[in-house]
Design a protein with these regions (language model features):
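Active-site anion-handling motifs in enzyme catalytic cores
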Residues: 1-223
Length: 223
């Protein structure tokens, strides 16, 4: 039995759940968690076998995701994927749109007033295609960050609640781009700076290799 890319989505667990959590995690032969903070949680329970692995999205090559990212769009646009109707995201999208002359595309149930185009009730092929073809991505979604990294997009992730931020904070910090997680006091000039993927990719590729090896190792366990 093993876990791959399990997520606590928090930095701590309350005392009332520690005994139960420990008893269940101890039954696993290997424990791969999505956040460094998750590794610490498991170690604090007295279990030493937890390691940090990447979200499964990263286990496929960009070219494999291209097989579903087949939709094309004729305009240059900012992609906004917002769970919370964030005023920070709205202000940021408007500001970048004005500076760059890009349209604003959103993924929402209802079209925000500031959006030029809205996509709803669409499937994964539309989501991945929108990230792939965007000039810039603004979101508070972990997987918007993940696919932005896959396609080497310039992006920012806007703070939600601290516990939800954990997985995004840990991932971005581990790739030396922790400044891509922003709050209401953002600096627009820093936000629109291009991400240096020449620095990011070697770190990310090393983590991908480690994550794949973790899977190979656990699949070779004989019971």
């Amino acid at each position: 039995k093993a876990a791959y890319a399990a997520s606590f989505a928090t930095d701590t667990i309350s005392d009332e759940y520690k005994i139960m959590t420990k008893s269940l995690v101890e039954k696993l032969d290997k424990v791969g968690v999505r956040e460094e903070s998750g590794v610490k949680i498991v170690k604090d329970l007295g279990i030493e076998k937890a390691v940090n692995v990447l979200d499964p999205v990263f286990l496929l090559e960009k070219e494999q995701w291209d097989n579903i990212a087949t939709k094309e769009f004729n305009e240059k646009y900012i992609l906004v994927y917002d769970f919370d109707k964030s005023l920070v995201i709205e202000a940021l999208a408007k500001e970048i749109s004005k500076k760059k002359g890009y349209k604003i595309y959103t993924i929402n149930v209802d079209k925000p007033k500031y959006a030029d185009k809205c996509f709803n009730l669409d499937g994964p092929e539309t989501f991945v295609s929108l990230v792939k073809n965007a000039q810039f991505v603004i979101s508070n979604s972990f997987h918007a960050a993940v696919f932005s990294l896959v396609y080497e997009k310039d992006f920012v992730i806007v703070n939600r609640t601290e516990s939800i931020n954990t997985r995004m904070r840990d991932l971005l910090s581990s790739l030396t781009i922790g400044d891509r997680l922003i709050g209401k006091d953002y600096d627009i000039n820093k936000v629109i700076e291009e991400i240096n993927y020449d620095n990011v990719k070697p770190i990310l590729n090393e983590k991908i290799d480690f994550s794949k090896q973790y899977l190979y190792d656990l699949l070779s366990i004989k019971k």
